Amino acid sequence: MPGKTAQKGGRPSGKGKKKKQTLKFTIDCTLPVEDGIMDASNFEQFLQERIKVNGKTKNLTTNIVIERKKSKVTVTSEIAFSKRYLKYLTKKYLKKNNLRDWLRVVAANKESYELRYFQINQDDEEEEDD
């Protein structure tokens, strides 16, 4: 065994290429779109204008693709992209269109968000009056 050298950490020698990661996030706007208070195509356009790549807006190139199927907006990224940043932009859109008081952004699962209405319980107020 004098010809072989032990490697630290048991990793293979040399630098290999990093595996290209593809991140895919969806935002489900079904409820507000069906009720007619929000336009999914307008939201898609907002994301295309506002998502920053390397500190610049409107710099999506081929790294980030935004697609819309009916009322679901999908953001596919080849570069590092935060799901939290997508939530931030969604909330910014809701605030801009005065929808922030009625809608909230909820994580449906690891890769998607959903726009839901706030639950307002009027039954509690009626019980307090008694």
UniProtKB/Swiss-Prot annotation:
Return the motif ranges for Nuclear localization signal: 17-20
Q: Where is this region: Disordered?
A: 1-21
| InterPro entries per UniProt | Ribosomal_eL22, Ribosomal_eL22_sf
Q: Which UniProt keywords apply?
A: Ribonucleoprotein, Ribosomal protein
Name the Pfam families for this protein.
Answer: Ribosomal_L22e
Q: Which family is annotated?
A: Belongs to the eukaryotic ribosomal protein eL22 family.
Q: What is this protein called?
A: Large ribosomal subunit protein eL22
